[in-house]
């Protein structure tokens, strides 16, 4: 079951997993304006607005931090994925994006599991997945049964003019975030 919420709400979660204290400390630094981690993530920028940039850092204990920024895409272009060996902790530091998340049994794999990438790719489900809005400070934790797609935008409809639809991309800025890859063994 995916967990999504303000990072400050996860105190009791981290209390259940003392082995994740380094993860909690790193995520705290990612949101602390004067920390080196925050400054590094906030400085991520491509040569153009539509460039994906990412850097990977080893945190120890087989935990990786992928600090990244990327252009947003329409929800119709969602890339649905899941992982077997790692749990994703995705924290938005700056900017914003939508995520779609659903239960693995509601999706049909497009590709077989790729063990070297720890990745299965899925087709868009018939049943609409849950939609979450990520902005600065929002953490999503995605377990192996959680198929997820991030970096999404949605058209919005004006409350005053039913004919007026605006792509929310115009209202969002490219996310600057971190994805922590945590081995599933930490949750056994």
Tell what function each PLM region has.
Residues 1-66, 79:
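A short, N-terminal "cap"/entry segment at the start of jelly-roll beta-barrel domains
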Residues 121-129:
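Acidic, glycine-rich flexible loop segments
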Residues 69, 91-93, 103, 144-146, ...:
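Short, structured patches in soluble enzyme cores that scaffold and shape functional sites
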Residues 132-154:
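Conserved metal-binding segment of the jelly-roll/cupin
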Residues 85-87, 91-101, 106, 115-122:
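Glycine- and acidic-residue-biased ligand/ion/polar-headgroup-sensing regions
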Residues 89, 139-141, 158-188:
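A short hydrophobic beta-strand segment most commonly corresponding to one strand
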Residues 75-83, 90, 101-102, 151-152, ...:
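Short histidine-centered beta-strand/loop micro-motifs
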Residues 59-60, 75-88, 107-110, 127-128:
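A short beta-loop-beta micro-motif enriched in histidine and acidic residues
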């Amino acid at each position: 079951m995916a967990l999504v919420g303000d990072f400050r709400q996860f105190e009791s979660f981290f209390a259940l997993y003392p082995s994740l204290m380094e993860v909690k400390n790193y995520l705290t630094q990612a949101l602390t304006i004067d920390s080196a981690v925050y400054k590094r993530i906030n400085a991520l920028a491509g040569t153009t607005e539509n460039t994906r940039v990412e850097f990977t850092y080893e945190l120890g204990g087989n935990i990786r931090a992928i600090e990244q920024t990327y252009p947003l895409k329409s929800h119709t272009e969602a890339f649905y994925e899941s992982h077997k060996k790692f749990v994703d902790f995705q924290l938005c530091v700056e900017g914003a994006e939508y995520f779609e998340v659903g239960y693995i049994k509601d999706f049909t794999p497009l590709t077989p599991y790729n063990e070297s990438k720890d990745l299965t790719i899925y087709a868009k489900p018939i049943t609409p997945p849950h939609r979450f809005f990520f902005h600065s400070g929002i953490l999503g934790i995605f377990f192996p049964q959680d198929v997820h797609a991030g970096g999404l935008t949605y058209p919005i409809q004006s409350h005053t003019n039913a004919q007026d639809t605006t792509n929310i991309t115009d209202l969002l800025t490219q996310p600057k975030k971190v994805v922590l890859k945590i081995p599933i063994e930490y949750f056994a």
